[in-house]
């Protein structure tokens, strides 16, 4: 034998209220779209002439300028190129310059 106990939790009460609202609202078929008082009907899709006018205003994309910062890197932030790569590159440049100087002498 099972006994049903009503659930008294906020979610259950909210869903019961929503069910009540859904049962008491007017069905969508009865709402319908009717012309406004001024006689104009509702327009769902944009007017093609508005589209052409809008496109003429957008001849180019806006430019965004991002300037590099010289501040310290926060921990966990990734940077490119990595500092180790820059150090290795500087060492290679120094080695190549030294080799050229030795050949010239």
UniProtKB/Swiss-Prot annotation:
Record's keyword annotation contains Cell membrane: no
Domain LBH: 18-104
Primary localization: nucleus
Location in the cell: Nucleus; Cytoplasm
Compositionally biased spans, kind Acidic residues: 86-96
Tissues where this protein is expressed: Highly expressed in heart, and expressed at low levels in placenta, lung, skeletal muscle, kidney and liver.
One Pfam family hit: Lbh
Keyword Glycosyltransferase carried by entry: no
GO terms, biological process: mammary gland epithelial cell differentiation; negative regulation of DNA-templated transcription; negative regulation of intracellular estrogen receptor signaling pathway; negative regulation of stem cell differentiation; positive regulation of DNA-templated transcription; positive regulation of mammary stem cell proliferation; positive regulation of somatic stem cell division; positive regulation of somatic stem cell population maintenance
Biological function: Transcriptional activator which may act in mitogen-activated protein kinase signaling pathway.
Protein name, per record: Protein LBH
Organism field: Homo sapiens
Lineage: Eukaryota, Metazoa, Chordata, Craniata, Vertebrata
Gene this chain is encoded by: LBH
